[in-house]
Structures are given as structure tokens and as C-alpha cells.
């Protein structure tokens, strides 16, 4: 997963 941080931020609870 390349830009997973942009697609799905780590703020997913």
C-alpha cells in the first residue's frame, strides 16, 4: 500500500 496514509489516515478508529 503506497499512499495509504493519504487514502486512509491513521485516524481510523
Curated annotation (Swiss-Prot):
A GO term for molecular function: ATP binding
Main location: cytoplasm
Family: Belongs to the actin family.
Organism annotation: Glycine max (Soybean)
Keyword Cell membrane: no
Subcellular location: Cytoplasm, Cytoskeleton
Domain of life (superkingdom): Eukaryota
Gene Ontology terms: cellular component: cytoplasm; cytoskeleton
Listed name of the protein: Actin-7
Role, per record: Actins are highly conserved proteins that are involved in various types of cell motility and are ubiquitously expressed in all eukaryotic cells.
Keywords: ATP-binding, Cytoplasm, Cytoskeleton, Nucleotide-binding
Positions in coiled-coil regions: none
Miscellaneous comment text of the record: There are at least 16 actin genes in soybean.
Residues spanning the signal sequence: none
Amino acid at each position: 500500500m503506497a499512499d495509504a496514509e493519504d487514502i486512509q489516515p491513521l485516524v481510523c478508529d
